[in-house]
Amino acid sequence: FIIKKKIKKARVYISAAGLYELFLNGRRVGKNRLDPTYTRFDRRNLYVTHDITSFLKEKNAIGIILGNGWYNHQSLAVWYFDESPWRARPRFCMDLKVTYEDGTEETLSSDKDWKTNSGGIIFNSIYTGEHYNASLEEEGWNNYDFNDEHWKKSISTTAPSQNIVSQSLHPIKFKEILLPTEMRKFNSKKYIFYLGKNIAGISEIKVRGEEGTVLRVTHSELLDEKGEIDLSN
Protein backbone atom coordinates (compact mmCIF):
# COMPACT_ATOMS: atom_id res chain seq x y z
CA PHE A 1 0.00 0.00 0.00
CA ILE A 2 1.09 3.59 -0.68
CA ILE A 3 0.93 6.59 1.64
CA LYS A 4 0.94 10.02 0.03
CA LYS A 5 0.50 12.33 3.04
CA LYS A 6 2.51 13.14 6.14
CA ILE A 7 1.81 10.78 9.01
CA LYS A 8 1.07 11.89 12.56
CA LYS A 9 0.68 8.40 14.03
CA ALA A 10 -0.19 4.86 12.99
CA ARG A 11 -1.46 1.85 14.90
CA VAL A 12 -2.13 -1.73 13.93
CA TYR A 13 -4.72 -3.90 15.68
CA ILE A 14 -4.31 -7.61 15.03
CA SER A 15 -6.15 -10.67 16.30
CA ALA A 16 -5.22 -14.25 15.47
CA ALA A 17 -6.63 -17.68 16.14
CA GLY A 18 -3.27 -19.32 16.63
CA LEU A 19 -0.05 -17.33 16.87
CA TYR A 20 1.31 -14.57 14.65
CA GLU A 21 4.45 -12.63 13.83
CA LEU A 22 3.87 -9.30 12.11
CA PHE A 23 6.30 -7.66 9.67
CA LEU A 24 6.22 -4.25 8.04
CA ASN A 25 8.67 -3.43 5.25
CA GLY A 26 10.82 -6.41 6.20
CA ARG A 27 11.06 -5.51 9.89
CA ARG A 28 9.46 -7.48 12.69
CA VAL A 29 6.87 -5.40 14.56
CA GLY A 30 7.01 -5.60 18.36
CA LYS A 31 9.11 -7.63 20.76
CA ASN A 32 6.28 -9.82 22.04
CA ARG A 33 6.41 -13.60 21.70
CA LEU A 34 3.57 -16.11 21.44
CA ASP A 35 0.85 -13.53 20.80
CA PRO A 36 -2.06 -13.63 21.27
CA THR A 37 -2.32 -15.61 24.47
CA TYR A 38 -4.58 -18.61 25.06
CA THR A 39 -8.35 -18.22 25.48
CA ARG A 40 -11.43 -20.35 24.90
CA PHE A 41 -11.25 -19.41 21.24
CA ASP A 42 -14.90 -20.21 20.58
CA ARG A 43 -15.91 -17.73 23.31
CA ARG A 44 -13.32 -14.93 23.23
CA ASN A 45 -10.50 -13.73 20.98
CA LEU A 46 -7.81 -11.20 21.81
CA TYR A 47 -6.28 -8.46 19.68
CA VAL A 48 -2.89 -6.81 20.17
CA THR A 49 -2.06 -3.17 19.42
CA HIS A 50 1.26 -2.01 17.96
CA ASP A 51 2.57 1.50 17.30
CA ILE A 52 3.95 1.37 13.75
CA THR A 53 4.48 5.09 13.15
CA SER A 54 8.24 4.68 12.67
CA PHE A 55 7.81 1.73 10.29
CA LEU A 56 5.83 3.43 7.55
CA LYS A 57 7.26 4.80 4.31
CA GLU A 58 5.70 6.00 1.07
CA LYS A 59 5.56 2.42 -0.26
CA ASN A 60 4.76 -0.27 2.29
CA ALA A 61 4.23 -4.02 2.59
CA ILE A 62 2.72 -6.02 5.45
CA GLY A 63 3.66 -9.64 6.07
CA ILE A 64 2.33 -12.08 8.66
CA ILE A 65 3.48 -15.54 9.71
CA LEU A 66 0.73 -17.65 11.25
CA GLY A 67 1.31 -20.55 13.62
CA ASN A 68 -0.97 -23.15 15.16
CA GLY A 69 -0.49 -22.18 18.81
CA TRP A 70 -3.20 -23.47 21.14
CA TYR A 71 -5.87 -23.00 18.46
CA ASN A 72 -4.87 -25.82 16.11
CA HIS A 73 -3.06 -28.13 18.51
CA GLN A 74 -2.10 -31.46 16.91
CA SER A 75 0.28 -32.95 19.49
CA LEU A 76 -1.16 -35.59 21.80
CA ALA A 77 -0.90 -34.88 25.54
CA VAL A 78 -2.74 -35.29 28.81
CA TRP A 79 -4.77 -32.08 28.30
CA TYR A 80 -6.33 -33.27 24.99
CA PHE A 81 -6.01 -29.94 23.19
CA ASP A 82 -6.03 -31.93 19.96
CA GLU A 83 -9.74 -32.60 20.64
CA SER A 84 -10.68 -28.95 21.26
CA PRO A 85 -14.10 -28.02 19.79
CA TRP A 86 -12.70 -24.81 18.24
CA ARG A 87 -9.79 -26.46 16.45
CA ALA A 88 -9.26 -25.30 12.83
CA ARG A 89 -6.62 -23.80 10.57
CA PRO A 90 -4.98 -20.60 11.93
CA ARG A 91 -6.52 -17.32 10.82
CA PHE A 92 -6.24 -13.61 11.58
CA CYS A 93 -7.86 -10.23 11.10
CA MET A 94 -6.16 -6.85 11.18
CA ASP A 95 -6.88 -3.13 10.99
CA LEU A 96 -4.13 -0.60 10.29
CA LYS A 97 -5.21 2.92 11.23
CA VAL A 98 -3.21 5.92 10.01
CA THR A 99 -3.77 9.45 11.31
CA TYR A 100 -2.34 12.15 9.06
CA GLU A 101 -1.01 15.55 10.05
CA ASP A 102 -3.95 17.24 8.31
CA GLY A 103 -6.30 15.49 10.75
CA THR A 104 -7.72 12.93 8.33
CA GLU A 105 -7.65 9.21 9.04
CA GLU A 106 -7.40 6.08 6.92
CA THR A 107 -7.96 2.44 7.87
CA LEU A 108 -6.56 -0.51 5.93
CA SER A 109 -8.07 -3.89 6.76
CA SER A 110 -7.19 -7.48 5.96
CA ASP A 111 -9.44 -8.91 3.24
CA LYS A 112 -9.57 -11.45 0.42
CA ASP A 113 -7.16 -9.37 -1.69
CA TRP A 114 -4.30 -10.48 0.53
CA LYS A 115 -2.08 -13.27 -0.79
CA THR A 116 -0.78 -16.36 0.98
CA ASN A 117 1.91 -18.96 0.56
CA SER A 118 3.73 -21.62 2.55
CA GLY A 119 7.18 -20.73 3.86
CA GLY A 120 10.17 -22.21 5.60
CA ILE A 121 8.20 -23.35 8.66
CA ILE A 122 6.61 -26.60 7.48
CA PHE A 123 5.39 -27.82 10.90
CA ASN A 124 4.86 -26.12 14.25
CA SER A 125 3.49 -27.18 17.62
CA ILE A 126 3.47 -25.60 21.08
CA TYR A 127 4.58 -28.94 22.55
CA THR A 128 6.95 -30.41 19.98
CA GLY A 129 8.53 -27.37 18.33
CA GLU A 130 8.84 -26.68 14.62
CA HIS A 131 10.33 -28.08 11.44
CA TYR A 132 12.06 -25.48 9.29
CA ASN A 133 13.23 -25.92 5.69
CA ALA A 134 15.51 -23.00 4.84
CA SER A 135 15.37 -23.84 1.12
CA LEU A 136 11.66 -22.89 1.07
CA GLU A 137 12.22 -19.43 2.52
CA GLU A 138 11.67 -16.67 -0.06
CA GLU A 139 14.02 -13.76 0.46
CA GLY A 140 12.28 -10.41 0.72
CA TRP A 141 8.76 -11.88 0.90
CA ASN A 142 7.67 -9.14 3.32
CA ASN A 143 9.02 -6.19 1.32
CA TYR A 144 7.18 -3.91 -1.11
CA ASP A 145 9.15 -4.86 -4.24
CA PHE A 146 8.65 -8.64 -3.79
CA ASN A 147 7.02 -10.39 -6.78
CA ASP A 148 4.06 -12.35 -5.38
CA GLU A 149 2.50 -13.41 -8.70
CA HIS A 150 2.95 -17.10 -7.82
CA TRP A 151 1.23 -16.68 -4.44
CA LYS A 152 -2.43 -17.65 -3.95
CA LYS A 153 -5.29 -15.39 -2.93
CA SER A 154 -6.30 -15.69 0.69
CA ILE A 155 -9.63 -17.13 1.81
CA SER A 156 -12.08 -14.94 3.69
CA THR A 157 -13.47 -16.68 6.77
CA THR A 158 -15.13 -15.95 10.11
CA ALA A 159 -13.59 -15.36 13.52
CA PRO A 160 -13.92 -18.24 16.02
CA SER A 161 -16.11 -15.97 18.16
CA GLN A 162 -17.83 -12.59 17.90
CA ASN A 163 -16.19 -11.43 21.13
CA ILE A 164 -12.88 -9.79 20.11
CA VAL A 165 -11.32 -7.77 22.94
CA SER A 166 -7.98 -6.14 23.72
CA GLN A 167 -5.23 -8.29 25.22
CA SER A 168 -4.49 -6.52 28.50
CA LEU A 169 -2.00 -8.82 30.22
CA HIS A 170 1.75 -8.29 30.21
CA PRO A 171 3.34 -9.73 27.04
CA ILE A 172 5.92 -12.48 26.85
CA LYS A 173 9.30 -10.95 25.95
CA PHE A 174 12.94 -11.92 25.88
CA LYS A 175 14.53 -11.30 29.27
CA GLU A 176 18.12 -12.44 28.83
CA ILE A 177 20.47 -14.41 26.61
CA LEU A 178 21.99 -17.52 28.18
CA LEU A 179 25.14 -19.18 26.90
CA PRO A 180 25.74 -22.90 27.51
CA THR A 181 27.67 -23.65 30.69
CA GLU A 182 28.75 -27.04 29.38
CA MET A 183 29.00 -28.91 26.07
CA ARG A 184 29.15 -32.69 25.83
CA LYS A 185 30.13 -34.42 22.59
CA PHE A 186 28.81 -37.98 22.17
CA ASN A 187 29.96 -38.46 18.58
CA SER A 188 30.54 -36.44 15.39
CA LYS A 189 26.80 -35.83 14.99
CA LYS A 190 25.49 -35.56 18.54
CA TYR A 191 26.11 -32.85 21.11
CA ILE A 192 24.41 -31.75 24.32
CA PHE A 193 24.51 -28.13 25.44
CA TYR A 194 23.71 -27.59 29.12
CA LEU A 195 22.30 -24.21 30.23
CA GLY A 196 22.56 -24.76 33.97
CA LYS A 197 18.93 -23.95 34.72
CA ASN A 198 15.39 -24.81 33.63
CA ILE A 199 13.98 -22.01 31.46
CA ALA A 200 11.27 -21.07 29.01
CA GLY A 201 12.89 -19.77 25.83
CA ILE A 202 14.11 -20.50 22.33
CA SER A 203 17.39 -21.75 20.89
CA GLU A 204 19.57 -19.77 18.51
CA ILE A 205 22.33 -21.47 16.57
CA LYS A 206 24.60 -20.52 13.69
CA VAL A 207 25.75 -23.33 11.43
CA ARG A 208 27.58 -23.96 8.19
CA GLY A 209 27.15 -27.02 6.03
CA GLU A 210 26.12 -28.55 2.75
CA GLU A 211 22.73 -27.78 1.25
CA GLY A 212 20.17 -30.36 2.32
CA THR A 213 21.84 -31.07 5.66
CA VAL A 214 19.27 -31.89 8.37
CA LEU A 215 19.78 -30.48 11.88
CA ARG A 216 17.68 -31.70 14.80
CA VAL A 217 17.51 -29.61 17.98
CA THR A 218 15.70 -31.27 20.88
CA HIS A 219 14.97 -29.64 24.24
CA SER A 220 14.80 -31.55 27.50
CA GLU A 221 14.43 -30.86 31.22
CA LEU A 222 16.12 -34.11 32.29
CA LEU A 223 19.19 -36.24 31.62
CA ASP A 224 19.28 -40.01 32.00
CA GLU A 225 21.93 -42.10 33.77
CA LYS A 226 24.15 -41.99 30.67
CA GLY A 227 23.97 -38.21 30.49
CA GLU A 228 21.72 -38.18 27.44
CA ILE A 229 18.44 -36.27 27.18
CA ASP A 230 15.39 -37.81 28.83
CA LEU A 231 11.95 -36.85 27.48
CA SER A 232 9.95 -39.15 29.77
CA ASN A 233 8.29 -36.27 31.63
Predicted feature descriptions by range:
Residues 1-233:
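Extracellular/oxidizing-compartment recognition motifs
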